[in-house]
């Protein structure tokens, strides 16, 4: 027996049906698809196709709208901060850039620190929001919480100020800007 002489056993391979090759073959003309219509055609039907009837997604009314650039608030627990510091992913002074570097937030995201778990080491944490319990636990362990007003992307766009100062600069409302402009004119 050689590799060149190997053959499948008799009856192991069955030739496929040749469809649409004349009426004498038994599966010619309509090729086993019945008579004409949508199901006789190639391709597929979408699951929401209702045979030409007005589909459900068009019968129901529309309301509301989707916010084009929604603000995403990512969360991280106090216990997780402790783990990240122990593993060496974060240092004792935790900034938004360090959160971004390990993939917790993106450039446009906001960050909220939640109070699940315990903290034993003194950490300086910078974030947009802190829950009451998180703030309490961090400060109880001898740490510090720094509230930031801007995202990383917004701070990078502010060319006049240093990056850290830009993050900490409170946003001025449109009304306040108008009032300031009026004062300058007067």
UniProtKB/Swiss-Prot annotation:
It comes from Chloroherpeton thalassium (strain ATCC 35110 / GB-78). Residues 21-31 have a biased composition (Gly residues). GO terms for cellular component: cytosolic large ribosomal subunit. This is Large ribosomal subunit protein uL15. SUPFAM superfamilies: Ribosomal proteins L15p and L18e. The keyword Ribonucleoprotein applies. GO terms for molecular function: rRNA binding; structural constituent of ribosome. Disulfide bonds: none annotated. InterPro entries: Ribosomal_uL15 (IPR030878), Ribosomal_uL15/eL18 (IPR021131), Ribosomal_uL15/eL18_sf (IPR036227), Ribosomal_uL15_bac-type (IPR005749), Ribosomal_uL15_CS (IPR001196). Part of the 50S ribosomal subunit. Binds to the 23S rRNA. Belongs to the universal ribosomal protein uL15 family. It comes from the Bacteria. Residues 1-51 are annotated as: Disordered. Keywords: Ribonucleoprotein, Ribosomal protein, RNA-binding, rRNA-binding. One of its GO terms (biological process) is translation. PANTHER family: 50S RIBOSOMAL PROTEIN L15, LARGE RIBOSOMAL SUBUNIT PROTEIN UL15M.
